[in-house]
Structure formats: structure tokens, C-alpha cells
Amino acid sequence: MLAFGSICGRLRAPAGAGLRVNVGKMPGRAWQVANGQPYSTFYAPPEQAGNRQKERRVTAWKKVRAAATFSASGMLVLGAAGVAGIVLYLILSELFSPSGDTQIFNRAVSTVEGDAVARSLLQCEDGVHRSERLKAYGDSVGDDRWTRNRPISSTRRLDASGREHYYMRFHVETGRRRGVVSLEAQQSDDSYQPEFVRMYLDVPGEKRHYLIRPEPSVAKPKGFLGLNWGPRKD
């Protein structure tokens, strides 16, 4: 017992001894309590203030990087949406526009199917209750189905007056014969649909058949030496 008491007495700290604390390694909240004043980087130890500045720089860089990433992603999304809108507009205008190649082609095929002379030249197998449908396709390089499914050959030009003209060429086929249809259409002043100016069918071994003939142009008569003599006539 005496030995244990002597050991405890030796471990007991003197009454007047002060507790030494390394405030430089204390966290911010404990440093505030120990010094009795609000905590800030001004009063904080140099090491802790430097850490705060590094954290602020890292946070600012993260914000800049996030903003740049968001801006780049937004630009990509807007660009993709713009390209998709243009493609959709071109597809819809091609399929449903009255002046599109698809609509002109469908009208031309219907005109050929409704012409009795053209059906006779193509030797359509028509009965009382049934009429043979024509197969129409673009320029072909073979007899198989895949090479026949090619785009229709068409061009567009402007005349001297600024009116647009459409030129198209495609093939028609029945179970017995084939032919080539060529047409010319021009922009109409009264309708959204171009009006057909010329359309004819060429069947091998047969005379060219005009489904639509162009209106003959009336030549203005000229007088002697190519001049019109006499008073002007309105």
C-alpha cells in the first residue's frame, strides 16, 4: 500500500503547473475557444490559412470546369437539334411538298397509268374487273430488284423570266414490256403544284407517244427585211 501511494504521488502534477497546448495544430473551432475570439484566416495560424486558400482555389477551378463542361454539352445538344431539324425539314419537304420530286413522280405515274395509248404500248393485261399496275423506278443498271430501286433522275433550272422548270426521267414496266417516260414541268402561277408542260413515252420498237404536248409557240410575223412596216397595231 505504501509503495502504490508513493507511485501515485509521483504521477500527480504540481498544482501550479500550466497545460501547454500547441495551438498551431488545433482545428479552427478549438482554436477559437482557446483564444476567446472569432475564428478567421487573419487570426488563424499560417498553415491553416494557406490550406483555406488552397481549398478556395480548388473550389473555384471545379466551378470553372463544371461551367465549361455544361456550356460545351449545351452547344453540342443545340447543334444536334439544329441538324436534326434541318434533316427533318428536308425529308418532309421532299415527301409532302407539291413541288417535291416524290409528288411530281407520283402524278406522272398516275398520268401514264390513266392513258389508254400508253397502256396499249406497254401491253398491259387489263380485264373487265382488273387493271394491271405499272412498275415505275429510276435508272437501272441490271434486272434485279435492288438495282431498280434507285433515285429518280431529275433536274431543276430557271428560265430567263425566273420561273423554275422541272425535268424528270424514269422507267415504267409491265409484265411484257418496258418504256421510258420523260417529262417537263414548270412552276405554276395559279397553284402550288407544278404544271406539266411536256410528257412522252418511249417504248423500244414503237413510235414516241406524247401524253402531254407543249403548246405551240405563235411566231410573230415579220415584214420585209425582218421589219414590220406600217402603223403599230396593239
From Swiss-Prot:
Any single Gene Ontology cellular-component annotation: TIM23 mitochondrial import inner membrane translocase complex
Side of membrane Mitochondrial intermembrane, spans: 93-234
Membrane association type: Single-pass membrane protein
Superkingdom of the organism of origin: Eukaryota
Keyword annotations: Membrane, Mitochondrion, Mitochondrion inner membrane, Protein transport, Transit peptide, Translocation, Transmembrane, Transmembrane helix, Transport
Transmembrane segments: 72-92
Main location class: mitochondrion
Cellular location(s): Mitochondrion inner membrane
InterPro entries: Tim21, Tim21_IMS_sf
GO terms, biological process: protein import into mitochondrial matrix
Assembly with partners or alone: Component of the TIM23 complex, at least composed of TIM23, TIM17, TIM50 and TIM21.
Family named by the database record: Belongs to the TIM21 family.
Reported function: Essential component of the TIM23 complex, a complex that mediates the translocation of transit peptide-containing proteins across the mitochondrial inner membrane. Required to keep the TOM and the TIM23 complexes in close contact. At some point, it is released from the TOM23 complex to allow protein translocation into the mitochondrial matrix.
Protein name: Mitochondrial import inner membrane translocase subunit TIM21
Species for this entry: Eremothecium gossypii (strain ATCC 10895 / CBS 109.51 / FGSC 9923 / NRRL Y-1056)
